[in-house]
């Protein structure tokens, strides 16, 4: 769901 990364924990 985050636009920049595949990791949901790291929201850019």
UniProtKB/Swiss-Prot annotation:
Chief localization: secreted
Organism: Liocarcinus depurator
Compartment(s) of residence: Secreted, Extracellular space
A GO-annotated cellular component: extracellular space
Name of the protein in its database record: Hemocyanin subunit 1
Keyword Secreted: yes
Tissue and organ expression note: Hemolymph.
GO MF, one example: oxygen carrier activity
Disulfide bond sites: none
Role description: Hemocyanins are copper-containing oxygen carriers occurring freely dissolved in the hemolymph of many mollusks and arthropods.
Alphabetized UniProt keyword annotations: Copper, Oxygen transport, Secreted, Transport
Domain of life from the UniProt record: Eukaryota
Family, as annotated: Belongs to the tyrosinase family. Hemocyanin subfamily.
């Amino acid at each position: 769901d985050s636009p920049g990364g595949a990791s949901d924990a790291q929201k850019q």
